[in-house]
Amino acid sequence: MAQEDTFKKIVSHCKEYGFVFPSSDIYDGLAAVYDYGQNGVELKNNIKQYWWQSMVLLHSNIVGIDSAIFMHPTIWKASGHVDAFNDPLIDNRDSKKRYRADVLIEDQIGKYEEKITKEVAKAAKKFGDNFDEAKFRDTNPRVLEHQKKCDELHERYAKAMEASDFAELRQIILDEGIVDPISGTKNWTEVRQFNLMFSTEMGASADASTKIYLRPETAQGIFVNFLNVQKTGRMKLPFGIAQIGKAFRNEIVARQFVFRMREFEQMEMQYFCQPGTEMEWFKYWKQHRLAWHEALGMGDENYRFHDHEKLAHYANAATDIEFHLPFGFKEVEGIHSRTNFDLSQHEKFSGKQIKYFDPERNENYTPYVIETSIGVDRMFLSVMCHSYTEEQLENGSSRIVLKLPESLAPIKCAVLPLVNKDGLPEKAQEIVNDLKFHFNTSIEAKDSIGKRYRRQDAIGTPFCVTVDGDTLNDNTVTLRYRDSMKQERVPIAKLREIIEDRVSITSLLKKIDEKN
């Protein structure tokens, strides 16, 4: 199945089964704005809980805050967002559509990479166990040609971005023959800058109002609270401050479902450390965050690091953790060494001293910062894309199953009375009433047992418990496993123990410790 077709099916599945809806749907929606449905919000909350506990529970020196979306406007001047938070935009004169020039070029680089991947996959299929991928990549003329073009384009693009050379970005687009996906033409305008922050007015009247911004990131709320947290928590370096919250960016090219939106949610942690130790902590957090992802069991081969060649104005090192989505490897998390830029800027613009007194060195200094920043929505999409599976069964039928990491599944257990009579629904409800205090449990009695299994498969429920006539006599039930469809008879008294051991967030946290 083509990757594009797979992605369309995943988007459709999300709406059909209550994961994601187009926002304002009865008004024909609002472009690139989505609402999370009853199953989507549970999955999203489980992702956030997993992240929060991995930060705050596993690290005694990391605490959390929840800062305001509206902040003093000078904060964004100090952080550089007012002057430097821009995207290079280009318009197609025929379609009247606007695009990010850098994204058009990155997509072109991705096309070269995809050609190489297809050549490798074709050869692997042809030669089987005797296939030497490394040798094939080093010797195959077509692969070498695609790789040469990819490397040359990447080098040229990186130089243009580093120099903010908009004329060169446009020339790259023209030289590569990049066409507008709607009009199919190359009739491009010049490239220009566009600030990504949403602004609004705060005040009782237009004359007395103050221009403020919807925050484009949650990080600045952490930086301006550094002293508040450090002093009230009696925190000693190194320590971290974690936060989960909404951020807003006026993306011109919002696309690929929930991957790139104008309203999104971030999970960020700023780790404050002694100057000179930042690269040691940068390395630590790279590996620790990768372990967090890999503990989900979505295939270590689906992750890779992408080190930045062009660094943001605040960073001295940066890398992305990328995940293999249907449209290529894309960033799901960034790890950055932000130096002391942010704290120094806020000290300068606020006129307040933002220093840490180190009792061991008997001196004041501005801490350096390592940031980990992950998009909740991108993580949600990664989990959905990896989990969506179409299976052909031995009996000739098929099923769609979401093989979600069990700890993240919206519903952990569905209790299904075999028939909706003879005291079975009442017995099923008794089981639900016992299990619901430990993990999310539902009851479903409508339709045949086979159809109910398929519905639970489609929303990723790891366990189904079938209550039948024998249950009333011996207090045993049939426990069905989602991925294998294996069924076994178990006592009701053991249900909680069997299921909880596999679906708790604790089981994931232990895997992180094992990987570290």
Question: Predicted regions: what is each one?
Answer:
Residues 1-516:
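NTP/phosphate- and nucleic-acid-binding module
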